[in-house]
């Protein structure tokens, strides 16, 4: 908190790894930040059980939640669960947290038009004002698929704009 005053910071963003693996740390820091009138931002995969998520939400001012795809099969490939992430996005929107969603498009995995249309429609059912960031994938670590063509990102963004007002292309 002392450094914040020197730097003029308005709060803390928990990001660049999955912050919720340290749930108690994030919760305790967010509580302290809230007590001092500072903002808490989460950049998360949104994969957390409902009860701790609901306990954390009143302490969070904004969240960017990864919606990694829109099929159960894709989430199984990732060893996650689509319905848990969708529920957590919905709950965050319902409590009035500023929510933005990011989808990293991976060629041959989650780059289908039908999936993006379903995702955009579902997000718009929560709010057509919900920002969606559609990001381009680049090969890293063990996943050696080719990078997402820029044209694919722009095409999927154009599809999403049929339902959402704020769609942004990333990593292009």
Spell out what each predicted region is.
Residues 114, 154-172:
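C-terminal accessory regions of radical SAM enzymes
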